[in-house]
Amino acid sequence: MNILVTGAKGMVGTALCNNLKNIRDGKNKTRPALNIEEIYEYDLDSTPAELDEYCQKADFVFNLAGVNRPENSEDFMKGNFGFASDLLNCLKKHNNKTTIMLSSSIQATLAGRFGNSEYGRSKKAGEELFFQYAQETGAKVAVYRFVNLMGHSRPKYNSAVSTFCWAVANDEPFTVNDRSTELELLYIDDLVEGMFDLLEGKEQHCEFDGVETVLKADGHYCCVPVTHKVTLGEIVDLLQEFKAQPTTLMMPKMPDGSFTKKLYSLYLTYLPTDKFKYALKMNVDNRGSFTELVHTADCGQVSINISKPGITKGQHWHNSKWELFIVVAGHGLIQERNINTGETVEFEVSGDKIEAVHMIPGWTHNIINLSETENLVTVMTCNEIFNPNHPDTFFEPV
């Protein structure tokens, strides 16, 4: 399959082309039905001759080209309707009736606040042109009316989310005019997966009730239904939480598919390189060190413990707190004793064979570095963040 992507250097085009190449090159094996040979990338610096060649050879067309912020309103029609005409005429010239996807906008509904949108009118005209082309040629046309897109793009241009991510990550000032303003957002990775579905003939269809998407199996339009409705206030509050994470160590709740998970990934792409690395607080004494790595709201914390040769650490028990000790370097011994029955167990552990050992509530425990020359390095997970006002930790030699 040869695929033509117009607007290949835009936010969507870049992400789509990168991921199409992953499939083509065998790096992404999640879509075994797709056999991609060539990816033709067309953008503003391409030539009419290249467009002509690509339209002749393409087995599928993603038309992402368009104008978002022209110098004058007339350029909306020229950029969004005019190029669409050129593209379709070129396909007609070569009698190429391959499937073609059109990237339109929710503004093309011309409903509600979009009633006077010049951008929406130009997108609507492009849609009508594509539907007419489908009737004339019998070619399959897939028109997507995208909501606000959320991906790495130029700040202070066409996306409030990108602007806020950039500003917070780079300590730049920003203004939120109304925290209650709600956005419906489509994340770039979800959009790309939707395009893969389209390539496989598994796209979802819809109609529109005003600006609301209504899934419908025989709908006139196509859609990627995985969107998120969030307020500007919620977005900036999350971003401030992300920014504080290297200091607080608190990792926000990020369930799979959640808006928070997607926003955090996007936020990180705006970090300046000098913020890629940050210091952690090492609690150091003559026995070694203990460093907390990550805190979570509902799964406790993860730490790294380093014990010097011959050192014993621990010698305490907990009522409800439990831990996992995972030695990743060195040679050690973990001992545990039930404080009520006196039963004892011990486990020899080594970085050469990584194993996890439970520290059970009600069992006092320790960890001993058996080496005379090497440090013992242990990853420790705990079901709660340490609270000095309620430590639940009681000294008791094993």
Label each region the model flagged:
Residues L44-D86, C90-K93, Q107-F114:
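NAD(P)H-binding glycine-rich loop region in Rossmannoid oxidoreductase-like domains
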Residues F131-L183, I188-K202, I235:
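NAD(P)-dependent short-chain dehydrogenase/reductase
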Residues D274-Q315:
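A short glycine-rich, His/Asp/Glu-containing loop-to-beta-strand
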Residues T341-E343, I368-V398:
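Double-stranded beta-helix
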